[in-house]
Amino acid sequence: MSKISFSPEKKDRKKKIRSILQGIFLIIILITTIKALFSFTKYDRFSDEILSPTEETGFIALSYFGVDRDGNNTLISTKNLEAQLEALKNNGYVTIEQQDILDYYTKGKKLPSKSLFLLFEDGRRDTAIFAQKIMEKLNFKGTILTYAGNLISDDPKFLDGEDLLDLAKSTFWELGTNGYRLSYINVFNKESQYLGELDSLEFSKISNTIDREYNHYLMDYIRDEYGVPKETYEEMNNRIDYDYEEMCRIYESEIYKIPSLYALMHANTGKFGTNDKVSSINEKWINELFNMNFNREGFSLNDRDSSIYDLTRIQPQSYWSTNHLLMRIWDDTKSNMSFIVGDEKKAFNFEKISGEAEFVNDKIILTSMPKGRGALKLKTDSKYKNVTVSTILKGNIIGSQGIHLRANDNQSKGIYIQLQNNHINIFDDNNKIYSFNLSEFEENKDKEKFDIKDRRDRLLDVKLYDNKITVVIDDKIVV
């Protein structure tokens, strides 16, 4: 019987090698974890070399409701946010800070030729996490807005005071506020039933049933179902004063100062509220507490003629394409803009008539001109008389899109199948020959009132043969 002998030295050597490999593996895991949790990148401010030659050059402001990994009806996806901000960077935009805006209006200092002020308005943790990774990549800086009440709430999805201090230290964030709380008054549902006052949680639970006829907490008197104030002037004054005082108390307790930037909810009232007396109280507090106020929404450009307490921003919707945002900014600024084309090989098959088109996989994202239309023409040497078309028309219910068949160059002749405001219309040489309300296919046939944000994708099949046309919507024969 043979004997096998083991060398203690060899065994120890194997243990040492195994320990070294395990140590290296743990170090790699540790480094990866640290990189995921902490950022070592610092924001690099723009150089004075790119300042505009004129003091008149203003800035655009973009304000996102919030960021979600996949996106939803309100929050933009990380993919879309990165695409939009990257397109702006490629067009020469750099981010500016609150101090730059203050110096622009109070000291007449110049800004970069293409200046972008970036805001995020929901104060959510996931917004800060997802947005910062993108801003680090692009060397962009933003302002995170919060409601003071959320800093001391038990809801973990909102940033607290410690979070805000950490964000400010990262160099990629500045702080701003929407006030003390998000709350609603004078609310009606879509059936015109009076709901009264709702907090943000109550509002969000039934938001799909609420009519656009409502107000934010600091905008008006609290009123009954007939529009009659339920409070005296003194009660209204005390109510609004309380919100500003609580906001100050919480911020000074949690982050040791009141943010210098305010965005009054809601925008576009003309002043600082929908009632003159309410507006005067808000105006007093705004001027006393803040260096600047974003008071309007819908336009991106602020210039020398704007008031620092009446600034405007554009709020990109979560469903906007990159070209839609670029088109809105181009319309506001009239500055040169490079739009996104996407798949250039597929784009080569089409002639652009108006607007801008992005080709992504099997999709064409067509963006219309401001107050105009977007149109593409398929390049072909053939004159198709009989055709079959199958496509999905994606987008919002409110609006118009369609397909021209057998059309001449200016589309004055031919067949036009139009989807407009939940109706299907068919035109022959610009004469409407058929119209059908698609609500007839729905469970709620009587619904005619749609919100501008309501979305509906439609599967459209069209067969045109000689003088006969067949149109099928969502597998239902229309004509």
Residue positions per predicted region:
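Hydrophobic membrane-insertion alpha-helices, especially the h-region
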Residues: 19-39
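Metal-dependent polysaccharide deacetylase catalytic core of the NodB/CE4 family, i.e.
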Residues: 65-68, 115, 136-269, 311
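Secretory/extracellular carbohydrate-interaction modules
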Residues: 368-434
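His/Asp/Glu-enriched short active-site or ligand-binding loop at hydrolase and phosphoryl-transfer sites
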Residues: 146, 202-207, 254-319
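Short tryptophan-centered beta-strand motifs in secreted/extracellular beta-sheet-rich domains
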Residues: 389-391, 449-473
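N-terminal Lys/Arg-rich, disordered targeting/topogenic segments
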Residues: 1-18
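Short, aromatic/His-centered strand-loop micro-motif at the edge of beta-sheets
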Residues: 432-459
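Extracellular carbohydrate-recognition regions
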Residues: 327-356
